Amino acid sequence: MSTTLNVPYRLEFSVEVPGTPEQVWQAIATAKGMSAWFAPTEMEEREGGSLHFTMGPEMGSDGQVTAWDPPRRLVYEEDWAALMGKEPDELSPLTSEFIVEAQSGGTCVVRVTSSGFGTGAAWESEFWDDLAPGWLPFFDNLRLYLAHFPGQEATQLEVTASHPGDAEALWSTLRDALVL
């Protein structure tokens, strides 16, 4: 089956984080840093290097670093066709670009763009619609990691529970208790 990859998908985010460009680079462009705020990561930290994110039991994403310009710009591609159980020629790679811009006052803005091309199938739109809000908690993690634990090894802990109260109030209470 021949497909035309002419439907563009693109998400853009911007987050201000504490730290120098070098500290932010260590967090976003090294296996140790990404493992601390995003997902357990294996990475050859160079252009052309391989990349693997562990997303859970028996689930991961493989990719390649396509641009490496410390401490300013990182680009990597992932095979989102494989993630979705599709044929590789059905989709372009999922490309993520991180740009670090120093700001006054000891902060940086991190601009993140995720993009790719597909065929316009309904499941593709659903994938991209779900991807957008999925990034947001990770940006909170990045901000907290750089504010309280820059350069330290860390791992994520996911705890789930049902609570009948207001989610915002509960989250605020939890953050205050953890001094975050």
Residues of each region from the PLM?
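A short, structured loop/turn motif at beta-sheet edges
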Residues: 21-22, 66-71, 100-109
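Short, solvent-exposed secondary-structure boundary/capping segments
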Residues: 72-79
